[in-house]
């Protein structure tokens, strides 16, 4: 068999992931995520946990229960047996947030060796928002449509102007590593990102949450879809025990126990700070506190 034909293999193959292999899954206005390669499956996690040769149990429900146990009790090494390599096209400012997750292998398009494409991320109208009043890192209420359109045009104009200067500097013979300095951080870059499943789930837990910036959340959402196709049992356990669950402090647990016993507990009596109290109430009463 010639390498790369995909006609024969003895390794674990996940057909749902094979169906989207090398396809560009669109993100934002011009970005994408593309699965380049992968290793392992749900079976690999189960096999590693049992430290045995073979395919685990014959009952899928038992494998799912074991994966749930591993996830619930924060085991790590069984999930590290699976790896995935992604080709990602993303705005530079998103890439700078992404690389805060250091437990992965990255090789990025180099503007020292090559010329960056004339492609910029421009947020759509509904994402043009004022500074949040309760989150120093986030955005708040969307701006009126006319103001948003003016800002979008400003982004476009500045991006085009800086790119024209970039091209002019290159034409003058300036080194590429210097000419790139004037580019805006909404320019698109590309990289290959290889990560094991444990660290990927950590990335998704942090970057798919409401506190993450919208743009990187969109990438996390797309990758979460890939994880669902790749390791459906792990995905289900991750959603159950991490993504849609909540962890509370010892003091918050005391408050919950008092409430279950019928006591009324105020924020002042709870010993919790205002922010933690608010977080606890949003978990207990997602539709708003009762009167």
UniProtKB/Swiss-Prot annotation:
Tell me if Ribosomal protein is a UniProt keyword of this record: no
Which GO BP terms apply?
dTMP biosynthetic process; dTTP biosynthetic process; methylation
Tell me the pathway.
Pyrimidine metabolism; dTTP biosynthesis
Its recorded name reads Flavin-dependent thymidylate synthase
Show where the record puts the motif ThyX motif: 100-110
Which residues are noted in the entry as FAD-binding?
Answer: 77, 100-102, 108, 196-198
User: Which species is this UniProt entry from?
Assistant: Anaplasma marginale (strain St. Maries)
The record's gene field reads thyX
The subunit structure is: Homotetramer.
């Amino acid at each position: 068999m010639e390498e790369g034909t995909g006609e024969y293999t003895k390794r674990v193959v996940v057909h749902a992931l094979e169906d989207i292999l090398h396809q560009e899954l669109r993100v934002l206005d011009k970005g994408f995520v593309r699965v380049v390669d992968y290793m392992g499956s749900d079976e690999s996690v189960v096999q590693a946990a049992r430290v045995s040769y073979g395919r685990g149990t014959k009952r899928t429900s038992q494998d799912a229960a074991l994966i749930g146990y591993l996830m619930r009790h924060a085991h790590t090494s069984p999930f590290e047996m699976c790896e995935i390599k992604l080709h990602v096209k993303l705005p530079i400012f998103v890439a700078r947030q992404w690389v805060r997750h250091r437990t992965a292998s990255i090789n990025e398009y180099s503007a020292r060796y090559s010329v960056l494409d004339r492609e910029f991320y421009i947020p759509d109208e509904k994402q043009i928002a004022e500074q949040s009043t309760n989150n120093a890192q986030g955005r708040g209420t969307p701006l009126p449509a006319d103001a948003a359109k003016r800002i979008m045009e400003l982004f476009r104009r500045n991006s085009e102007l800086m790119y024209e200067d970039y091209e002019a500097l290159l034409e003058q013979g300036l080194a590429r590593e210097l000419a790139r300095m004037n580019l805006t951080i909404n320019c698109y870059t590309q990289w290959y990102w290889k990560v094991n499943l444990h660290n990927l789930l950590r990335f998704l837990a942090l970057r798919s949450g409401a506190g993450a910036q919208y743009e990187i959340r969109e990438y996390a959402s797309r990758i979460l879809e890939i994880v669902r196709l790749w390791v459906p049992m792990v995905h289900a356990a991750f959603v159950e025990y991490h993504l849609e669950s909540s962890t509370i402090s010892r003091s918050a647990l005391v408050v919950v126990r008092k409430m279950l016993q019928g006591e009324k507990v105020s924020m002042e009596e709870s010993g919790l700070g205002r922010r933690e109290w608010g977080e606890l109430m949003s978990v207990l009463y997602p539709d708003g506190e009762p009167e």
